[in-house]
């Protein structure tokens, strides 16, 4: 009979290719051991590209000229960071209602702003523990994205893509996670794909051979999609290089986009198609 375990916080990658697990000291009569899930070596990063206004913006931290200095906020201070709660949104609506067009143009002057990665990720907790270590969320640029719009998606992808099977205590039997069972039970015809076969357990087994760390990729949505695509291209290169440096097999990423993020991803994919395994668009403009 398998012994009972308790889930530990998500692991932290080490430069030598290993993983670090954090636990706590317990009394000697507490016999339930901590369980850390070690990801596979093959890594396929998933990068979420938000829609227009979904990236936090701040005044440039180090303006190089007078023209790059924002007239309304100090260097490094937020210029666009929507609140993440309903009361906060109502309050912000009242505040912004007092701003006249001239003030808004000065505040949101594209030449004086940059992507702000210091937003609070607001990590959600799954039934069996946190979706991702808060330190990793910061390092993966989750703070660039508006949490109220995208944190649920980020957490869901991080958990569901990397949690495929499990073993229930007192049962020496592998089971499929409920979120994947729902996908298997779904009729593809309901989604407009009548000729597609439902997902199989064999396909899930192949899926589980890879690690899917989830990243954010904000961009300066007041500037052109071309500039945003260049930033995304650099983000893809940085992520792939990171995992290779940590002795992981990593050649391609998957992009998950929303709205204007789809246009950014398409422009990027034209230049580096070999580094993108696939793109999943959500509500992309025509």
Language model segments and positions:
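N-terminal non-catalytic accessory region
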Residues: 1-256, 260-286
């Amino acid at each position: 009979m398998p012994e009972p375990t308790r889930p530990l916080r998500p692991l932290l990658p080490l430069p030598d290719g290993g993983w670090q697990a954090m636990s706590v000291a317990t009394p000697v009569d507490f016999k339930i051991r901590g369980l850390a899930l070690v990801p596979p070596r093959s890594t396929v990063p998933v990068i979420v590209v938000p829609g227009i206004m979904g990236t936090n913006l701040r005044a440039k931290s180090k303006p190089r000229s007078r023209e790059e200095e924002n007239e309304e906020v100090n260097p490094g201070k937020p210029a666009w960071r929507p609140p993440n709660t309903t009361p906060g949104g109502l309050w912000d609506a009242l505040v912004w209602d007092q701003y006249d067009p001239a003030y808004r143009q000065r505040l949101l002057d594209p030449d004086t702003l940059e992507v702000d990665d210091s937003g609070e990720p607001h990590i959600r907790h799954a039934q069996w523990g946190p979706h991702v270590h808060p330190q990793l969320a910061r390092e993966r640029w989750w703070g660039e994205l508006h949490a109220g719009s995208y944190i649920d998606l980020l957490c869901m992808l991080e958990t569901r893509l990397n949690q495929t099977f499990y073993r229930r205590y007192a049962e020496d039997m592998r089971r499929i996670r409920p979120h994947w069972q729902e996908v298997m039970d779904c009729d593809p015809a309901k989604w407009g794909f009548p000729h597609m076969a439902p997902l199989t357990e064999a396909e899930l087994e192949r899926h589980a051979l890879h690690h899917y760390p989830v990243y954010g990729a904000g961009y300066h949505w007041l500037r052109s999609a071309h500039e945003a695509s260049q930033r995304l291209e650099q983000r893809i290169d940085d992520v792939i290089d990171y995992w290779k440096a940590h002795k992981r097999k990593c050649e391609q990423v998957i992009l998950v986009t929303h709205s204007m993020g789809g246009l950014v991803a398409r422009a990027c994919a034209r230049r580096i198609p070999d580094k993108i395994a696939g793109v999943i668009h959500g509500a992309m403009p025509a």
